């Protein structure tokens, strides 16, 4: 499908729904050690506790915000100009890059000179790409191993802490019961972190820039931050940090336009997508990607073999190292932050898939398997891996080593092909680390619950704790249309066991290309799974939001319940289906139980009765039961009464 002309006209814009602030929320910025380290967070305002429940102040809570400038009313959003180059000064100040005279990729130059693409191109880029100076390495891992704390690392430390300390201090200062309130709202259940370094007996009270540097230096975390994507807001992927989620977007040969993909990106980050992968396989892949990157505040990943295949008209056997290499450079100079590269699909593993129920289900894996069989040679990705590393470190592109032999059904889970490839990915990780190139490892797939932990344990062992990035896994194969749920179950589990980033699955998985509604559904499901994993691991401060929402629920602060939740719009919509009037927003019940059977209202009544009688809640319950017993006998001791 050709690009939508309306999107590319002078009035091109993102839809208003993607840029409006979320209810009762505002963008706030926390400044670091220098003025241009301004870390965004979402502040959610809360109402005071009603007088009947104590009348105390409830200070705002702060949550991680991936939406970039889009939800900041003070920001001027023009997708034809792109986002501000947030990291440009930091990159320049390091003095180890050079601005190129033009594009290095032959295909990139061809597209730039093609008059047929003139009306499709992103018009707002007025700078040439950068590359490392000769002999220099510009990866965040390289800096970390030199003992350097970069502005990106400081930014991340501030971001991961989510102003938790300030929130608790505000609680303490909120009134006479402030200290008690802070202790209650800061309380968190101990987690089980399966050996993760940041948790347990010596858990960090807060994430520090030095801790970020150390985790990146060890290879346990990555900061995907291509020097040609200065618009990105630094983030980190590692099991000692908040579990992140990725959203896949991208056109296909039969549907979607450039405009729709940009809208999907802004929609995905609004609801919490930490990274976005552009998996476009249709027309104008190069131009689509440029629009997305220039307007994205989150890291962008791709699978370069998809575009390379388009360059040879879809014939896998016609792929060459030279075409693939040019594609890597083309995308690196556009600013792609991480590449999925299926270098672990080796010739010797392909026959191991013959007895599978569903064979090879990875598109990238099947492309490389077909090439290996057609030439009866080892994959050129494997053979040229060191050369790929040289490209990656010249732009600071991170590896996402692809699981091309992942199981496509629970029948095939943890088989010889899958685990053989995983072991190879561990070997390739060591090669990449020799070049100080950042690496994460992709994982399955379809795995029943009882086999999930084995996947995590083997990955940690064979890949030396490089971050794991998994698609789900889907825990059953019986629910087309609901695979965001079948996979969300597995995602929560594997996130708890140590996976650093979860790739979302939408309700359209296995059925079709997701639209914006599907993207939101997938994002919310996976934010839920990631948060559940953070709670289970005992991540510092993970329970703050739960505690705030629970307190609002108990105090019947309906608007706060909606707004603190992951999807305020849906929560409000569901409530208003049965109780649409404004008066219902202050009622001490909902339509589930009604006014007489609300457990929380009954508890409040017990507390009020106890206060009036000057006794404890336990004594109040006992006294109340005694009163009711006498009343029961006086009315005839009948269980049922005729009306």
UniProtKB/Swiss-Prot annotation:
User: Which co-factor is required?
Assistant: [4Fe-4S] cluster
EC number assigned by the record: 4.1.99.17
Q: Name one GO cellular component term.
A: cytosol
Record GO terms (molecular function): 4 iron, 4 sulfur cluster binding; carbon-carbon lyase activity; zinc ion binding
Q: Does the keyword Cytoplasm apply?
A: no
A Gene Ontology biological process annotation? thiamine diphosphate biosynthetic process
Pfam families (UniProt xref): ThiC-associated (PF13667), ThiC_Rad_SAM (PF01964)
Reactions listed under catalytic activity: 5-amino-1-(5-phospho-beta-D-ribosyl)imidazole + S-adenosyl-L-methionine = 4-amino-2-methyl-5-(phosphooxymethyl)pyrimidine + CO + 5'-deoxyadenosine + formate + L-methionine + 3 H(+)
What enzyme class is recorded for this protein? Answer: lyase
Q: Per UniProt, where does substrate bind?
A: 248, 277, 306, 342, 362-364, 403-406, 442, 469
Entry's HAMAP family?
ThiC (MF_00089)
Q: Subunit structure, briefly?
A: Homodimer.
Similarity remark: Belongs to the ThiC family.
In terms of NCBIfam families, this protein maps to: PRK09284.1 (NF006763), PRK13352.1 (NF009895), thiC (TIGR00190)
Q: What is this protein called?
A: Phosphomethylpyrimidine synthase
Question: Gene name?
Answer: thiC
């Amino acid at each position: 499908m050709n690009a939508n002309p309306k999107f590319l006209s002078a009035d091109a814009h993102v839809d208003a729904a993607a840029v409006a602030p979320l209810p009762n929320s505002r963008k706030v910025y926390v400044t670091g050690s220098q003025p241009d380290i301004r870390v965004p967070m979402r502040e959610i305002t809360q109402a005071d506790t009603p007088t009947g429940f104590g009348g105390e102040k409830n200070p705002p809570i702060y949550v991680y915000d991936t939406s970039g400038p889009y939800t900041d009313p003070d920001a001027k959003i023009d997708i034809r100009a792109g986002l501000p180059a947030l990291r440009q000064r930091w990159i320049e100040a390091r003095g180890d890059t050079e601005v190129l005279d033009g594009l290095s990729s032959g295909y990139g130059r061809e597209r730039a000179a093609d008059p047929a693409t003139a009306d499709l191109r992103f018009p707002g880029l007025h700078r040439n790409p950068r590359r490392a100076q000769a002999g220099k390495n510009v990866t965040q891992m390289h800096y970390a191993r030199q003992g350097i704390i970069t502005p990106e690392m400081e930014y991340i430390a501030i971001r991961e802490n989510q102003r938790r300390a300030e929130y608790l201090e505000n609680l303490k200062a909120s009134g006479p019961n402030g200290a008690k309130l802070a202790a209650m709202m800061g309380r968190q259940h101990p987690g089980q972190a399966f050996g993760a370094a940041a948790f347990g007996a010596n858990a960090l009270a807060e994430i520090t820039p030095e801790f970020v540097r150390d985790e990146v230096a060890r290879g346990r975390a990555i900061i995907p931050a291509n020097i040609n994507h200065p618009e990105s807001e630094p983030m980190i992927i590692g099991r000692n940090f908040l579990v992140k989620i990725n959203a896949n977007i991208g056109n296909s040969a039969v549907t979607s336009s450039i405009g729709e993909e940009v809208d999907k990106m802004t929609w995905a980050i609004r609801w919490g997508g930490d990274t976005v992968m552009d998996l476009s396989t249709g027309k104008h892949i190069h131009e689509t990607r440029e629009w997305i990157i220039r307007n994205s505040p989150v890291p962008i990943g791709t699978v370069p073999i998809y575009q390379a295949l388009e360059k040879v008209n879809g014939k896998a056997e016609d792929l060459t190292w030279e075409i693939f290499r040019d594609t890597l450079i083309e995308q690196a100079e556009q600013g792609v932050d991480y590449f999925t590269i299926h270098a672990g699909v080796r010739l010797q593993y392909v026959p191991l898939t013959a007895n599978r129920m569903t064979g090879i289900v990875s598109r990238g894996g099947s492309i490389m398997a077909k090439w290996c069989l057609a030439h009866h040679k080892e994959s050129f990705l494997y053979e040229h891996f060191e050369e790929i590393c040289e490209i990656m470190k010249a732009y600071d592109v991170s590896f996402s080593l692809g699981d091309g032999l992942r199981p496509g059904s629970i029948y095939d889970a943890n088989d010889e092909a899958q685990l053989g490839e995983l072991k190879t990915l561990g070997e390739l990780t060591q090669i990449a680390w020799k070049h100080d190139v950042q690496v994460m490892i992709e994982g399955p797939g379809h795995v029943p619950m009882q086999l999930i932990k084995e996947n995590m344990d083997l990955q940690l062992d064979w890949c030396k704790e490089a971050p794991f990035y998994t698609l789900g896994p889907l825990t059953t194969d019986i629910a087309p249309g609901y695979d965001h749920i079948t996979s969300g179950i597995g995602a929560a589990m594997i996130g708890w066991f140590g996976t650093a980033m979860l790739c979302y699955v939408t309700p359209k998985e296995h059925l079709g290309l997701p639209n914006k509604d599907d993207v939101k559904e997938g994002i919310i499901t996976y934010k839920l799974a990631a948060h559940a994993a953070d709670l289970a691991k005992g991540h510092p401060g993970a329970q703050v939001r739960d505690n705030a929402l629970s307190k609002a629920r108990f105090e019947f602060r309906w608007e706060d319940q909606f707004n603190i939740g992951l999807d305020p719009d849906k929560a409000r919509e569901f409530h208003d289906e049965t109780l649409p009037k404004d008066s219902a927003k202050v009622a001490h019940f909902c339509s589930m139980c009604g006014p007489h059977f609300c457990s929380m209202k009954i508890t409040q009544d017990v507390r009020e009765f106890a206060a009036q009688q000057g006794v404890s809640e336990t004594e109040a319950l006992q006294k109340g039961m005694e009163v009711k017993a006498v009343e029961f006998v006086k009315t005839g001791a009948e269980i049922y009464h005729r009306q």
